[in-house]
């Protein structure tokens, strides 16, 4: 069974979803979709399906669509194939003209599953959170820099005066962390990237940490609470002297990578790398 997740805010998404349904049903593959789309697509409503029977998820949208569906349906762990109807698309990297050849590859087993690490975090007496890309501690409505003390396995690292701090996974290294000056990590690497956001001190650079460690972030400034957000979707507040704890999650994000997939080609295309300068 395949779970199909169109993003109705993308104009062609539902039309393409209907075409995908026809393609898969003609090959005797059962399909489910969220209840609001199931009737329109004439497939099984997700609320009536045992999620353990779902073999694959297919997302139609961009990377944001993938992140939202992971947070909305945390109990569905089937590998995910992302069809790109958005802009950059590092996670959703199947182009429109490659949809049906890619589905054929999926059906015939011409793929592998990347188990990408996730980060989980918690604050005392507050619900825990998880993220595929990153957890961000941000100054929120505070109009000035905030002070964040960072500890690694309880050992003091540094106090950063900045707009905030990004705790990124390798998947997230091409997202917010990259925009803030962080390095690119290949997606199956296991590591954290700590990337300060607009630090006051130029020498405060991003740092890559091994995944087995735990990270503690203490909010030192006597200002309004700051915001802790996971993948830009869910968030909660962190008050002065509260400590946010982050570590590798026991859960992974399983992404379908077709045999034809070339991560470095994706990097070149999405980041506009042109190779050697021609003079």
UniProtKB/Swiss-Prot annotation:
Residues of the active site: 63 (proton acceptor)
Entry superkingdom: Bacteria
GO cellular component, one term: cytoplasm
Swiss-Prot/TrEMBL cofactor(s): a divalent metal cation
PANTHER family the record matches: NAD KINASE
Residues binding NAD(+), per UniProt: 63-64, 68, 133-134, 163
Cell membrane in keyword set: no
GO biological process, one term: NADP biosynthetic process
Entry keyword set: ATP-binding, Cytoplasm, Kinase, NAD, NADP, Nucleotide-binding, Transferase
Protein name listed in UniProt: NAD kinase
InterPro entries hit by this protein: ATP-NAD_kinase_N, ATP-NAD_kinase_PpnK-typ_C, NAD/diacylglycerol_kinase_sf, NADK
Localisation per UniProt entry: Cytoplasm
Protein's organism: Protochlamydia amoebophila (strain UWE25)
Family named by the database record: Belongs to the NAD kinase family.
SUPFAM superfamilies recorded: NAD kinase/diacylglycerol kinase-like
Task performed by this protein: Involved in the regulation of the intracellular balance of NAD and NADP, and is a key enzyme in the biosynthesis of NADP. Catalyzes specifically the phosphorylation on 2'-hydroxyl of the adenosine moiety of NAD to yield NADP.
Catalytic activity: NAD(+) + ATP = ADP + NADP(+) + H(+)
Catalytic activity, EC: 2.7.1.23
């Amino acid at each position: 069974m395949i779970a199909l997740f169109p993003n109705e805010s993308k104009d062609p998404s539902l039309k393409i979803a209907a075409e995908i349904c026809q393609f898969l049903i003609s090959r005797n593959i059962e399909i489910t979709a969220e209840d609001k789309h199931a009737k329109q697509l004439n497939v099984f409503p997700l609320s009536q399906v045992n999620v353990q029977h779902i073999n694959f998820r297919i997302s139609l949208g961009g990377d944001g669509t993938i992140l939202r569906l992971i947070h909305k349906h945390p109990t569905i762990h089937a590998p995910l194939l992302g069809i790109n109807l958005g802009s950059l698309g590092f996670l959703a990297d199947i182009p429109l003209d490659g949809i049906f050849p890619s589905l054929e590859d999926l059906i015939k087993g011409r793929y592998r599953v990347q188990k990408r690490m996730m980060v989980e975090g918690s604050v005392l007496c507050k619900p825990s959170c998880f993220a595929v890309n990153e957890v961000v501690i941000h100054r929120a409505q505070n109009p000035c820099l905030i002070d964040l003390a960072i500890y690694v396995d309880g050992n003091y690292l540094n106090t950063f005066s900045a707009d905030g701090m990004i705790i990124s996974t390798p998947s997230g290294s091409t997202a917010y962390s990259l925009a803030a000056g962080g390095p690119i990590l290949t997606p199956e690497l296991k590591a954290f990237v700590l990337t300060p956001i607009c630090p006051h001190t130029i020498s405060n650079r991003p740092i890559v940490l091994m995944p087995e460690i735990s990270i503690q972030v203490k909010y030192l400034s006597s200002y309004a609470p700051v915001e802790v957000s996971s993948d830009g979707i869910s968030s909660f507040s962190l008050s002065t002297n509260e400590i946010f704890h982050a570590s590798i999650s026991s859960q992974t994000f399983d992404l379908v990578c077709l045999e034809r997939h070339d991560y470095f080609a994706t990097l070149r295309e999405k980041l506009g790398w042109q190779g050697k300068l021609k003079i």
